[in-house]
Regions:
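The feature captures the beta-strand-to-loop junction immediately N-terminal to the Walker
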Residues: 33-35
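Helical segment within the ABC ATPase nucleotide-binding domain
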Residues: 172-186
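ABC-type ATPase nucleotide-binding domains, specifically the catalytic core motifs of the NBD
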Residues: 12, 30, 93-110, 121-123, ...
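A short, proline-enriched helix->beta-strand linker immediately N-terminal to the Walker B motif
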Residues: 151-155
């Protein structure tokens, strides 16, 4: 479904990715782990057209999307839930959700149906639907960011550090939601996450990024048992 082939991405003269390659198949959860500054977020930004690789290609459903603009990539069904949640703080919860469907030009009836679908998944958002998003807790804002991403009915969704700054009980709930999106909606997921243990636990495959290079990849359950992974990322 998605193939990133040997991309090298720079910020000015600083190289963030060095001939990095990943693949995501139909109905997979694929995680990317690595230390801060390893290039994980740059991989997602490259896929979304927020920064363009200097070399290499990105192919989605057989189409070369390497140099497309972000709005063109969004129109193809790829959704990015960035690090830090980035809700619109002055808008209400419901207005934030509607912004997620802005590019789709849905009818009023379709919009209401999608809103109710998200409210069924996140009852707390329904309770707070008229409340300014900036007044929500960190966990509620993260759930809002995920729900907003789902409003456009994505064909693939990418999460960048979704557990950052959240209480453990909220983290567990959030990962359950990500699993259900993949399982129930059959939507492929790319998960960038510093909580490597959790990421390896819910994904089928994983890539390890170090200094912009893919150093290791494979079955997540097998990687979780490897000494090098335990030592570097799992506290063992």
């Amino acid at each position: 479904m998605l193939k990133v082939d040997q991309i090298s991405t720079f910020y000015g003269k600083v190289q963030a990715l060095d001939r990095a390659s990943i693949e995501v198949g139909e109905n997979e959860i694929v995680c990317i782990i690595g230390a801060n500054g390893a290039g994980k977020s740059t991989m997602m930004r490259s896929i979304m057209g927020l920064v363009h690789p200097k070399s290499g290609t990105i192919t989605y459903q057989g189409e070369n999307i390497t140099n497309l603009k972000t709005n063109q990539i969004v129109s193809r069904g790829i959704v990015y839930v960035p690090e830090g949640r980035e809700v619109f703080p002055e808008l209400s919860v419901e207005e934030n959700l509607e912004m997620g469907a802005f590019s789709r030009k849905y009818t009023a009836a379709k919009m209401r149906s999608l809103l109710e679908e998200q409210y069924a998944v996140y009852p707390r958002l329904k309770e707070r639907r008229k409340q300014a998003a900036g007044t929500l807790s960190g966990g509620e804002q993260q759930m809002l960011a995920i729900a907003r991403g789902m409003m456009s009915e994505p064909k693939m969704i990418m999460f960048d550090e979704p557990s950052l700054g959240l209480a453990p009980v909220i983290v567990d709930e959030m990962f359950d939601v990500i699993v259900s999106i993949n399982r129930d909606k059959h939507i492929p997921v790319i998960l960038v996450e510093q909580n490597a243990y959790a990421a390896l636990g819910i994904s089928q495959r994983c890539y390890v990024l170090e200094n912009g290079e893919i150093k290791m990849s494979g079955n997540s359950a097998e990687l979780r048992e490897m000494h090098e992974i335990k030592k570097a990322y799992l506290g063992g």
